[in-house]
């Protein structure tokens, strides 16, 4: 039977260098909180539970965890999420001590950092294999500039780090000697340790160090003293253990994350004009032969069908775009809670806006400066320029003229407009809801329609044209 995994996530830090009132672990990377990435990673390990240790902004952190965006199909729904508070913050060892009452001795405790979002589940599985329920396993990395990191001190010499030699200690940078500071192998902040051993070692910690803190890393010397093997799983991918302590570091890690998203999509066959000018802030699923131009942002849950083409500078959130659709440049699609559906072969934009609840059928055309909100457009309907469709049901092959709008709001409530199949709406019309335009009807340009119109009828509602011959324009009066 596999040893149960209990994950402890360090999320108590203030993040002073972020210069923000928002707790550091709630700052976003790829459209999701740093902490959300870590929790999802824990879930993909099939962990029994995750204990989030909160401190600074604890109430905000705990509340946010209930609303963190889930990746499609992830296992987080099966992860038991619990909380412990570290008040005051007296070091990493003190932090883990707050979680101990929630941990059972039959498991392995995996310690992660809430501000280290790019660690991969495969890396942690390898670390857990090294632990094997009986060893203290550390995730380490060789760094050209290890300043600020705890150094891995191995048997034999303190100035070198041979991967084959026994780990003897972790020395924090501020407590390290000059010789120890010459070591380039660093501790990532991630470890796996049998909980029954961790419990005893935590209670032996003291704060006799430069920072007067209880270091979790001191358990290494206790393990050595007790004859417990201390092993290191060394990786080469620095981004997997990179933490966020400032807006600069957050921006740097964002670009790493986005490039990895872009690379994964291109390996699936997606054609990106420039992977350096592409952002995914949620999840993006693409069919075969999808093309995406530069400076596009995808947020929430977005699905692109086969052969979809996305023009430059588009923002698309929470939308499903069917095969063969073309989204021209500068289009904004935001499905929010209701979602947006774009049918096969539809043409959208440029400069179009699709708002929540827009449901567009096959071969629908939505042109420049057209806004659609909470409306259904059937196959072949067209609104090619300068128009608004809100709370409307539009039939097949409708042509909706430039400058026309549905007046859907009476100051208190929204009302629906129904435009039946094969209707032609002239330019600059106002359809005052609730109203129905009968099948095959025509509304003359400039009309304000307030009553239902019968099928096949021409409906015109506008003031009579008056022309005054020999009209003299007013002359501007000279002042002084």
Curated annotation (Swiss-Prot):
Residues where UDP-N-acetyl-alpha-D-glucosamine binds: 24, 86, 91-92, 113-115, 150, 172, 245, 355, 373, 388, 399
Disulphide connectivity of cysteines: none
Co-factor binding details: Binds 1 Mg(2+) ion per subunit.
Listed GO MF terms: glucosamine-1-phosphate N-acetyltransferase activity; magnesium ion binding; UDP-N-acetylglucosamine diphosphorylase activity
Top-level EC class: transferase
Cofactor(s) demanded: Mg(2+)
A cellular component term, taken from the record's GO annotations: cytoplasm
Pathway: Nucleotide-sugar biosynthesis; UDP-N-acetyl-alpha-D-glucosamine biosynthesis; N-acetyl-alpha-D-glucosamine 1-phosphate from alpha-D-glucosamine 6-phosphate (route II): step 2/2; Nucleotide-sugar biosynthesis; UDP-N-acetyl-alpha-D-glucosamine biosynthesis; UDP-N-acetyl-alpha-D-glucosamine from N-acetyl-alpha-D-glucosamine 1-phosphate: step 1/1; Bacterial outer membrane biogenesis; LPS lipid A biosynthesis
Biological processes, Gene Ontology terms: cell morphogenesis; cell wall organization; lipid A biosynthetic process; peptidoglycan biosynthetic process; regulation of cell shape; UDP-N-acetylglucosamine biosynthetic process
UniProtKB keywords: Acyltransferase, Cell shape, Cell wall biogenesis/degradation, Cytoplasm, Magnesium, Metal-binding, Multifunctional enzyme, Nucleotidyltransferase, Peptidoglycan synthesis, Repeat, Transferase
Keyword Coiled coil found: no
Highest taxon of source: Bacteria
Pfam families: Hexapep, NTP_transf_3
Catalytic site: 385
The enzyme's E.C. designation: 2.7.7.23, 2.3.1.157
Record-linked CDD domains: GT2_GlmU_N_bac, LbH_GlmU_C
Reaction it catalyzes: alpha-D-glucosamine 1-phosphate + acetyl-CoA = N-acetyl-alpha-D-glucosamine 1-phosphate + CoA + H(+); N-acetyl-alpha-D-glucosamine 1-phosphate + UTP + H(+) = UDP-N-acetyl-alpha-D-glucosamine + diphosphate
NCBIfam families referenced in this protein's UniProt entry, alphabetically: glmU
Protein name according to UniProt: Bifunctional protein GlmU
